[in-house]
Amino acid sequence: MTLMPFRVVQYLSVVLLSFTSLAQQPTPTLTPDQALRQYRESKATTLRDDFGERGRYRDANAALKPPAPGENRVVFFGDSITDIWHLDEYFPGKPYINRGIGGQTTPQMLIRFRQDVIDLHPKVVVILAGTNDIAGNTGPMRLEDIEANYASLAEIARANHILVIFSSVLPVHNYTPRSLNMYAQRSPEKILALNHWLKDYVATHPGCIYLDYFSAMVDDKGLLKRDLAEDGLHPNAAGYKIMAPLAEAAIAQALAAAKP
């Protein structure tokens, strides 16, 4: 057996130690603006080729059968908070369909609303959006622009005899290192203002209901309760356990109100 010269072994040891040292270096922390820029760059091709990401559920929609007679089909429609919600675990046996796409804003949702909601013929659509608009995921958004998109979603749904549930925007927190950018990009004041508008809108529009997640998930500082999300935005299992019965109650309310 040929032994490796001592100097070669020594050199390789130094190289390996160097790589180990580099691997252990802390990842540079991005500012909120840098994180947002990085997100936009990562989505640039997708947003250019299919801004609404209509292709995401194309095959699933094509395979979906029409609702059975008497079926109370519900579409949960929104961004990542909906996308990562395992509906079958929280609503077993219910004809509930998930059409969330992570990172989306209301202008993107408008583009895919026909394919992912109208054409599926639900009785109810549960819309949870707004947080990424406030963050500026697809560009700066004024509150009045977000509100106009919400109104358009509701009008399209009601024109197709679909009941609308507007979910409140969830609070955010800054209690963990992972949450700092999420919080900095999402003004609590804007979240409150948008929720106030949503509540006022449904009060004057028949066929629309307000689903208040916010009040059940906010702490005494006006932030998302620490134990409901690690990154300050996306609910964990404890968060979804709070949300599920609230959603179920709102769906029951919508269906009951629609009965002749």
Give the predicted meaning of each segment.
Residues M1-V75, D83, L87, L120, ...:
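N-terminal secretory targeting modules
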Residues Y39-F51, G93-P107, A135-M141, G232:
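Acidic/histidine-rich helix-loop elements
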Residues V75-F77, I97:
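Conserved beta-strand elements of the Class I
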Residues F77-G78, S167:
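Short hydrophobic segments within beta-strands
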Residues S80, I101, T131-N132:
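Active-site metal-binding loops of divalent metal-dependent hydrolases
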Residues T82-D88, T105-Q108:
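Short, solvent-exposed loop/turn elements at domain surfaces
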Residues E89-P95, L110-P260:
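Alpha-helical cap/lid subdomain in secreted, periplasmic
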